[in-house]
UniProtKB/Swiss-Prot annotation:
Keywords: Cell membrane, Disulfide bond, Glycoprotein, Lectin, Membrane, Receptor, Signal-anchor, Transmembrane, Transmembrane helix
Source species of the chain: Mus musculus (Mouse)
Extracellular side: 90-226
GO annotation terms (biological process): natural killer cell activation; negative regulation of natural killer cell mediated cytotoxicity directed against tumor cell target; positive regulation of natural killer cell mediated cytotoxicity; positive regulation of type II interferon production; stimulatory C-type lectin receptor signaling pathway
Record field: transmembrane: 69-89
Topology of this chain in the membrane: Single-pass type II membrane protein
Record note on quaternary structure: Heterodimer; with KLRI1 or KLRI2.
Cellular location(s): Cell membrane
Gene: Klre1
Disruption phenotype: Viable and fertile, with no gross abnormalities. Development of natural killer (NK) cells appears to be normal. Cytolytic activity of activated NK cells against allogeneic target cells is significantly reduced.
Domain C-type lectin: 120-225
Protein name: Killer cell lectin-like receptor subfamily E member 1
Residue ranges, compositional bias (Polar residues): 7-18
Amino acid sequence: MDEAPVTRSTLNVNSQQKSKAKNKIKNTLNSNELSSIEQRKKYQKHLKKHKNTAEDISGKGNCSPPWRLLSSVLGAMCLLLMAVAMVMTTFTTKSSSERSSSTIQQEGLHHPCPENWVWFRCSCYFFSKEELIWRDSQRACLSLNSSLIRMNKEEMNFFSLKSFFWVGVYYNETRRQWLWEDHSVLPSGLFSKLEANMKNFCASYKSKEAYMEENCANKLTYICKK
């Protein structure tokens, strides 16, 4: 059998058919690629939506993060401790005040002083209203089973009077120094401002910064101590 002659038109037809086949294959591949890309985009969009939903639930839900709950608990505990501390401080202050008052009352009962006498540091003091010379003041205190006050630094810090009173200090001309009424020497620094060489002089007292030499024949009020 004789083969049909190959003509240019036949070649063109074959070429067109091959070109169409290639385009069809190419379009098919492109379509598949597009479909795959679209699927990936849809999947990524789905993941993103799911992630946002999870964040909304964790951020806006009813369940608070643990650190918020912990801070609330700690804040409440701090307020409670402050309230307890305030109550304890008030109670301690009140108890201390009551104990101090009770102690003073008990000490006053244990160390009672006669009427018109003042109690201080386990001693009783009498502040006279009458004025006498120093020697007569001595005798008046002796009649009350006491003596003219022999002051110490604590008493000088405590007693601040409105006027001058006789105390148990006089100037001894023979020894040329100030002595207590029992002739003992004054402690160093006590009544240090009194001047020497004061014949027939005794000491009068008003406060720790106000005491002076006074002629023993002058009349003053006096302080007795026992």
